[in-house]
């Protein structure tokens, strides 16, 4: 069915759950995974450039460290399950394009990603990046949604 699954992550809890699901699917299929996180480039929104001399370098260091942290979590999940895993941090202006390009460039035959991530109001129904990947990708997409609480769990919580 699938031999190589791409698992995008933004470090959110739902993204981590999607990675676990993707790793479980890969294990069941005897597939491997590639985990990708996308770092957007530094942008200057202020006209006072003298205040920003160190900002691009600091931003780059921060984003590299954050990406490494997200990828390390995913690699550990895959290692515990015994699933072969590659990890990549891609810098790109548009995360959805980076996800699609990574899937194509690395020969992935499926993308499994969370229904939404960290990005504000647009993430309430279906994340904007997820929607763009669904709209533009020729690689099949599996969208992971957080499971709803069971009636027993809801009753126990009240």
Language-model regions, residue ranges each:
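Solvent-exposed polar/charged
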Residues: 27, 104-105, 135
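Short, flexible loop segments at boundaries between secondary-structure elements
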Residues: 139-150
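Short, well-ordered secondary-structure micro-motifs
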Residues: 18, 45-48, 97-100, 123-125, ...
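Short, hinge-like loop/turn segments at secondary-structure boundaries
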Residues: 50-54, 103-106, 129-130, 157-158
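Structural beta-alpha unit
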Residues: 76-111, 148-158
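Small/aliphatic-rich secondary-structure junction motif
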Residues: 3-54, 77-86, 158
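A short acidic, glycine-rich active-site loop
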Residues: 54-69
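Glycine-rich, Arg-bearing micro-motifs that act as flexible, cationic patches
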Residues: 110-136, 150-154
